Curated annotation (Swiss-Prot):
One of the essential components for the initiation of protein synthesis. Protects formylmethionyl-tRNA from spontaneous hydrolysis and promotes its binding to the 30S ribosomal subunits. Also involved in the hydrolysis of GTP during the formation of the 70S ribosomal complex. The gene is infB. Residues 242-246 are annotated as: G2. This is Translation initiation factor IF-2. Residues 67-81 have a biased composition (Basic and acidic residues). Residues 353-355 are annotated as: G5. Residues 208-375 form the tr-type G domain. Keywords: Cytoplasm, GTP-binding, Initiation factor, Nucleotide-binding, Protein biosynthesis.
Length: 706
């Protein structure tokens, strides 16, 4: 036999992967997990050992039936005999129980693996997941629901037959009946996919696949123009006219080889998708304008690519423009850890002109070169696995999703699971609108036939049939619902010490935003000096300007804290941070941040006040009023402005002033508050430098009881 995975051999022998791994360790055969491979000698040795064990068990139990050469059937049947053994007291009840267990075995193997049954006939040990439905527990224990519920009431718990109980409660109930429960390892969706639906590939089945490329860079540095030049089309112009089929990805051919370009914004390919565990990008093209150099979004793109551990190719664009200085770009890139090959580094740089079409072929050849070095491979002769790039609800087609096939081949008619949705592929079209019957690895296709709209980053998996697809999706939906009810465990300063003590935090990632570059560097250096033997502090991104949506998504993907100095988060960033539970801290003085983090690391953080946002007003005009100074004619865009509130004046994302309201008027009347959608005049106490377009934020400081 050829090399075999641990889980495959375990299935053949009729034992659990965990049991087989323990046996391997007893034999001094080192394996990492259930996906590890075994050579022929080790596999044959195990088969012999387990065959001998089976013969001993069979002779001890004096079974009259002839031993079948396929020992795994005996091993599978034995747990069922115990599980379904008829009780003399109530034979009818067990007949029903037997039927239910039979029905259960017809469902996907997933249920047995995660939540239900794995029995040891000798030791009476049952194995369950982190929780179990009470009805399933009664079947396992071979007891009536009334009997088990009565036991739980005696333990002070009121539960119903369909209620989920945790492992500790289930173990307590089982012990009342002399049965021991073991907790199985909790599997995530990827484990389910690898172990139960689709086996891992053999090295000999893998073939080269086209690379998937994302183009990133600062605004106006020529990302879209470069893609236009690469695809030899004016995509922007055509999309405006509604001609081009936009599915979020496109393909080009060069030297009879294919390259796939993702059209999604570069940062999204690295943040929102990476936060969901999906890696879609193989190579990142970093576009830098030769006349402009490295800019804030360029640095952001570098940090995203580094965090995702993706190879970078630099495209120095606009070399045809006056003032283009390639050496300056290379110098600035080296300052941010990107060392070009010509300067002794390992990052490829290609000078290009998207408008003139200069060196476009050279750039594509470099992509193919990196692809050859990285050896991107997939197995086209297996069930497909892919990832969702975009998804929407179309009035005519229903749910439409753009999927990048990462492994295997997807066919029209395949039953699929996509996150917590499912369906059968009704139709597939490529980036030019052609209908396809099948899609191979690194092909982007638009599919229809899903039950609901999936999220970008969800994994698509082909399964055996519609029933398995539906059951798997429903199970994932239930799991997601349970997870939603729990508070997402993000790192925050308030509980940093506790997480350090429990060993949950080994590295604290920090994103620093400030009003000037000097502050960013000073803060990064000061914070990184705070590292100790329990936790190391690492600044994964630093930039100038307001805290943006992109910063929050990077923090969510990297489990980081955001610290801001003299800057504020945008409205969108604030909303997303609440949803993703990302901790944002803003300061006026650098040392306050250092003291806070230092105090949190030694368990001394005890904040007395919390800032509560009340509302925002946009300054539409500024008037000089005799005796009152400058009054800001404002429109309330969010919440409300209170006369007694503290305020800060924000200009272009930078905090210009913090203070109190001197006057608040509607027409000629003094008022205590003004709500959303109304205009008013706001006088800021002892401050007159108000300009049109400024944002006035009102807030109060609320005491926190700990």
């Amino acid at each position: 036999m050829s090399k075999v995975r641990v889980y495959q051999l375990a299935k053949e022998l009729g034992v659990s992967s965990k049991e087989l791994i323990i046996k391997l360790k007893d034999l001094s055969i080192e394996v990492g997990n259930h996906m590890s491979t075994l050579n022929d000698d080790d596999a044959n040795l195990l088969i012999e050992l387990f065959t001998e064990d089976n013969k001993e068990v069979n002779s001890d139990s004096n079974q009259e039936s002839k031993v079948n050469t396929d020992d795994k059937l005996d091993k599978i049947d034995k747990p069922n005999k115990i599980e379904n053994a008829p009780s003399e007291e109530n034979p009818k009840k067990n007949k029903k129980s037997k039927k239910k267990q039979k029905n259960k075995k017809k469902g996907p193997t997933m249920k047995d693996e995660k939540g239900l049954i794995e029995e040891n006939t000798d030791e009476q040990i049952l194995e369950i997941g982190e929780s179990i439905i009470l009805k399933d527990l009664t079947h396992m224990l071979d007891k009536t629901p009334t009997e088990v519920i009565t036991k739980l009431i005696g333990l002070g718990m009121m539960v119903t037959i369909n209620q989920e109980i945790d492992f500790d409660t289930a173990a307590m109930v089982a012990s009342e009946y002399g049965v021991e429960l073991k907790q199985a390892g909790v599997m995530d969706d990827s484990d389910v996919v690898d172990d139960l639906i689709i086996p891992e590939d053999d090295e000999k089945d893998l073939m080269s696949r086209p690379p998937v490329v994302t183009v990133m860079g600062h605004v106006d540095h020529g990302k879209t123009s470069l893609l236009d030049a690469i695809r030899k089309t004016k995509v922007t112009a055509k999309e405006a006219g509604g001609i081009t089929q936009h599915i979020g990805a496109s393909e080009i051919q060069i030297n009879d080889k294919k390259i796939v370009f993702l059209d999604t914004p570069g940062h999204e390919a690295f943040t929102s998708m990476r936060a969901r565990g999906a890696k879609v990008t193989d190579i990142a093209i970093l576009v830098v304008a030769a006349d402009d150099g490295v800019m804030p979004q360029t640095i952001e793109a570098i940090n995203h690519a580094k965090a995702a551990e993706v190879p970078i190719i630099v495209a120095i664009n606009k070399i045809d423009k006056p003032g283009a200085n390639q050496d300056r770009v290379k110098q600035e890139l080296s300052d941010h850890g990107i060392l070009i090959e010509a300067w002794g580094g390992d990052v490829i740089a290609v000078p290009v002109s998207a408008i003139e079409g200069t060196n476009i072929n050279e750039l594509l050849e470099m992509i193919l070169l990196v692809s050859e070095v990285e050896e991107f491979k997939a197995n086209p002769n297996r069930q497909a696995i892919g990832v969702v790039i975009e998804a929407k609800l179309d009035k005519g087609k229903g749910t439409v999703a753009t999927v990048l096939i990462q492994n295997g081949t997807l066919h029209v008619g395949d039953s699929v699971v996509v996150g917590s949705t499912y369906g059968r592929i009704r139709a597939m079209t490529n980036h030019v609108g052609e209908k396809l019957r099948e899609a191979t690895p690194s092909t982007a296709v638009e599919i229809t036939g899903l039950s609901d709209v999936p999220e970008a980053g969800n994994q698509l998996v082909v399964v055996a049939d519609d029933k398995m697809a539906r059951n798997t999706a429903e199970k994932r939906a239930h799991k997601a619902k349970v997870a939603q009810q729990k508070i997402t465990q993000r790192v925050s300063l308030d509980d940093l010490y506790n997480q350090m003590q429990q060993g949950e935090i080994k590295e604290l990632n920090i994103i620093v935003k400030a009003d000037v570059q000097g502050s960013v560097q000073a803060v990064k250096q000061s914070l990184e000096k705070l590292s100790n033997d329990k936790v190391s502090l690492r600044t994964i991104h630093g930039g100038v300007g307001a805290i943006t949506e992109s910063d929050v998504m990077l923090a969510a993907a990297s489990n980081a804290i955001i610290t801001g100095f003299n800057v504020r988060p945008t409205s969108t960033a604030t909303a997303i941070s609440k949803k993703e539970k990302v901790d944002i801290r803003t300061y006026r003085i650098i040392y306050n941040a250092i003291e806070d983090i230092e105090a949190a690391m030694v368990g001394m953080l005890d904040p007395e006040f919390k800032e509560v946002d009340l509302g925002k007003a946009e300054v539409r005009a500024a008037f000089k009023v005799p005796g009152a100074g400058v009054v800001a004619g404002s429109y309330i865009t969010e919440g409300k402005i209170l006369r007694s509130a503290s305020i800060r004046l924000v200009r272009d994302g930078i905090v210009v002033h913090e203070g109190a309201i001197g006057s608040l008027r509607r027409f000629k009347d003094d008022v205590k508050e003004v709500n959303t959608g109304y205009e008013c005049g706001i006088g800021i106490d002892k401050f007159n430098d108000v300009k049109e377009g400024d944002i006035i934020e009102a807030y109060t400081m609320e005491e926190i009881k700990r």
